[in-house]
């Protein structure tokens, strides 16, 4: 009986400790990923002021996520032409490819963003097929 009681006491001490360690780990990972995820979300949801502030602070506008997508890829995919145009004019890499092998110009064509596609072309943008020639 004493042995069983000691085991219960040990578990009562152990579980809060594990929970505390897991909470610290989660908070640390959350803080590490917060800035990158937030900026990609800003491109997806059309938060142009956040994007402009990010770029004006000199941060990497060609940062790629786990899918190889950049702010320009996401703004094109989401139809936020104002952000896309701002990024192109700010000299984002217009020929960077995502993990699907698609360039920003491929996305502009696919999303039928004619004006943005023209601008990307003016800044030297090419399609995947053109890059592979």
Residue spans for each PLM region:
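A generic tandem-repeat structural signature
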Residues: 93, 98-113
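Ankyrin repeat structural motif
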Residues: 47-55, 80-89, 113-122
């Amino acid at each position: 009986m004493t042995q069983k009681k000691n085991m219960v006491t040990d578990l009562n001490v152990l579980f809060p400790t594990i929970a505390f360690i897991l909470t610290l780990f989660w908070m640390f990972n959350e803080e590490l990923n917060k800035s990158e995820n937030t900026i990609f979300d800003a491109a997806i949801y059309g938060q142009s002021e956040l994007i402009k502030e990010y770029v004006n602070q000199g941060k990497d506008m060609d940062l790629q996520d786990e899918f190889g997508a950049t702010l320009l890829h996401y703004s094109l995919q989401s139809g936020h032409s104002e952000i896309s145009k701002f990024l192109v004019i700010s000299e984002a890499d217009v020929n960077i490819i995502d993990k699907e092998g698609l360039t920003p110009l491929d996305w502009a064509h696919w999303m039928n963003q004619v004006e943005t596609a023209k601008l990307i072309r003016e800044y030297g943008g090419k399609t995947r097929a053109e890059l592979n020639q």
